Amino acid sequence: MIGDIRKVTAKIAERFKHRFYGRTFQCPVCHLELALVDVNGNRLMVCPVCGVVLDVEEVYGHAVPVVLGVEVRRPQPKTRIHPLATHLPIGLYPFAVLGAGLLLIVSILGPVMPGLAPLLDRAPVLADATLVLLVLSVGFSVVTFFSGLRDWYRRYRRRPYAQIRLKIAFSVIFLVLGGLAIALHASGAAFSSATGLVDLSSPLALVLAAVEIAVLGAGMVVIATLGHVGGTLVFGR
C-alpha cells in the first residue's frame, strides 16, 4: 500500500515539475533532473546535490551536460534543521486530513448506522485532535520554510534552481491552505464545536465542511509534491 501511495505521489509531483521546470536534463553524476532554464549565460551550472560544475551544450536540440569539475568549497552547515523539520509537517498533516474525513463520514452515516455510536460519542475529542494536528503541522511548516530559506542562502548560495523556486512557491501555498483549514476547523462553522460533527440540517455547515475537506485535500497534494522534490535534493534520483 505504501508503495502505491508513493507511486501516486510521484505521478502528481511529476506533473507539477514538468510544468514548472520546462525542458530538463539529468546530472551525469547523481542523475538529478535539472531545468535547462537554470543554466547561466555561460552555459554553466552547479548541481545542487553532488556539486559538480556542468557545461551544458545544445547538440541537435538535446541538452548534453559535461562535467568540468567539482565545487570544492561548498558550505556544509553542521546543523541543517530543514531536512529534520520537514518530517513533522509531512508526518502529522495526513492524520489531520484523516481525522476531518472520518468526522465527515460519521456525520453522514452515524444517524443511520448504530455501529458508529461509539464514534459519535468521541467526535468532539476527534475534532479537537484534528485541530491540534493541523496547528502543529502548519506551525512546524513555518519553521521548515524559514530553515529551508536559510539553507538556500548558505548551502546553495541563492542560486535560482527550479527545485528551489517550486519549493518556495508551494511552501507559501501550503501555509495559506493550512491557515484556511485551521480557521475553518477552529471556527466551529463546519464541524460543530459542541458535537464535533457537521450539522446536516445546515446548508452553510455542509458547504463549509466540503470546502475544508477540499482545502485539506489540496494541501495533501502540495505537501506531497514538496516532500518528493525535497527528497530529490537530498538523494538525487
Predicted feature residues:
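Juxtamembrane helix-capping/reentrant segments at transmembrane boundaries
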Residues: 158-173
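Alpha-helical transmembrane segments and their membrane-interface junctions
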Residues: 179-199
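Short, non-ligating residues that shape and space the ligands of small metal-coordination modules
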Residues: 36-37, 56-57
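Short cysteine-rich clusters marking metal-coordination/redox-active sites
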Residues: 27-30, 47-50
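Transmembrane alpha-helix entry/boundary detector in multi-pass membrane proteins
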Residues: 81-89, 117-139, 163, 167
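Residues immediately within or flanking Cys/His clusters that coordinate Zn2+
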Residues: 22-24, 42-44
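Hydrophobic cores of alpha-helical transmembrane segments in multi-pass integral membrane proteins
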Residues: 88-103, 130-149, 170-184, 213-227
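Cytosolic juxtamembrane amphipathic/interface segments immediately preceding
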Residues: 70-81
